[in-house]
Amino acid sequence: MIIEKRELEQLPERGEIIIDADGHIAGRLATYVAKALLERPSLRIVVVNAEKLVITGDRKMVIEWFKRKISEWRTHYNPEKAGPKIPRRPDRVFKRIVRGMLPKKNMRGRSALKRLRVYMSIPLEMLNRKKLVLYEVPLAKLKVKPLAKFVTLEEVWRNIDFAAWEQWKRAQEIWQKRIKQVTGG
């Protein structure tokens, strides 16, 4: 995996860039992605390792917020409520965060969102391509601060929808074996 560090001003005008989201704070990375999509109409952005994105805040508070939002969906007791659906999977959560930063009611925002792809882990066809790190916010820096509290999107997903997370984890193990076979490692 080749990692290249760049700032937002140094991004190419067209083509496709792959951003490794490992250890990034979800909101900060989303602002960079949204701004790049709006400023460069011929640039496609692919974000990989979405499950390793970080949400800052107390672990229990963040998980309870997601659980509360999901429980506000239509229920047996309140069948009339059909409010906004909150995604559970980390890739969809990040895409939803970016969508909130784009002007989705006009054509520019909708086309920008169509040019964004978000994946959990790294797809096989993108293994040997250059990954881009926009800025340095590793988990180690978050752990150094004594009051810094954070939770990864994978942990949130595990606490919200354990069955789906467990199924993904099993598929991930099979995927890792396949990658080793393909790369010869």
Swiss-Prot record:
GO biological process entries: negative regulation of translation; translation
Function: This protein is one of the early assembly proteins of the 50S ribosomal subunit, although it is not seen to bind rRNA by itself. It is important during the early stages of 50S assembly.
Subunit structure: Part of the 50S ribosomal subunit.
Transmembrane domains' residue ranges: none
Protein name: Large ribosomal subunit protein uL13
Pfam families: Ribosomal_L13
Keywords recorded for this protein, A-Z: Ribonucleoprotein, Ribosomal protein
Family: Belongs to the universal ribosomal protein uL13 family.
Highest taxon listed in the record's lineage: Archaea
Organism: Pyrobaculum islandicum (strain DSM 4184 / JCM 9189 / GEO3)
Record's GO cellular component terms: cytosolic large ribosomal subunit
UniProt GO MF annotations: mRNA binding; structural constituent of ribosome
Signal peptide, first to last residue: none
InterPro entries to which the protein is assigned, alphabetical: Ribosomal_uL13 (IPR005822), Ribosomal_uL13_bac-type (IPR005823), Ribosomal_uL13_CS (IPR023563), Ribosomal_uL13_euk/arc (IPR005755), Ribosomal_uL13_sf (IPR036899)
